[in-house]
Amino acid sequence: MKRIFVQNRELVVPGTLLAQGPYKNGRGTFREGSRIYSTVIGLVDIKGNTIRVIPLEGPYIPEVGDNVIGKIVDVKFSSWVVDIGAPYLANLKIQDFTDEKIDLLRTDLRKFFDIGDIIYGKVKAITEVNNIDLTTKGMPFNGGPLKGGQIVKITPSRVPRVIGRGGSMINMIKKLTMTRIIVGQNGWIWVNGKNEALEKLAIEAILKIDRESHTKGLTDRIKSLLLSRLQELKEKGVIEEIPELEEEPQEETEVNNNDGETRRT
């Protein structure tokens, strides 16, 4: 018998029966025979045949394929050490950064990424001893470094709420605040605005979503907040016009694109 007993993004508690049959159990779950149960309080995340539960609280627990924002904390001979907010530091090897042949004896890797730089990568592999390997190949901006802006850190389980259904929430924030935003699935968000006031407004909206993620009518409240603040900025002469939204965003219930990536629209 093959059956899923819960909905994607459903809040579950430890011991909740999630699925039965040939599904793969991910983080936050355990298997007993053919049945998969939750081990934590969190949100169900279903990707293909894999079922995991994202804890409501606690550090980011990486999964292969996650797009993450990280900070370079050390530069080694042939790799970089990256903080992605997980219990363990991640590694970015030179071969996962570029296909170009690099003479490591003559090249200082700090010319590419230095300590303190912010990068955008994908979790490539996780070993049994929790070694986390990243790759920046094929990522927007070639993985970075991401210049300017600020890093906002939210609870990882609330990332889908920030993104919204089909990107509705984050695209609304980007459109109205005229900012560049990249959302990492580790809960780190890069925000780069045209000016300080717009950047702060985008951050205010994101943090409000983080605080109120499990409440109804959040999309309307975020829209109201943004329009109210923008009207104030217009009256002060900070901006000339308030951008118009092409479509009314719908209240988000799930994330269709699981990569957590957003770009300027």
Curated annotation (Swiss-Prot):
Region (Disordered): 241-265
Signal peptide start and end residues: none
GO cellular component, one term: exosome (RNase complex)
Main subcellular localisation: cytoplasm
Subcellular location: Cytoplasm
GO molecular function: poly(A) binding
Acidic residues biased stretches: 241-254
CDD domains the record matches: KH-I_Rrp4_prokar, S1_Rrp4
Annotated keywords: Cytoplasm, Exosome, RNA-binding
SMART domains, per database record: KH (SM00322), S1 (SM00316)
PROSITE patterns listed in its UniProt record: KH_TYPE_1, S1
PANTHER family, alphabetized: EXOSOME COMPLEX COMPONENT RRP4, PNAS-3 RELATED
Name by which UniProt lists this protein: Exosome complex component Rrp4
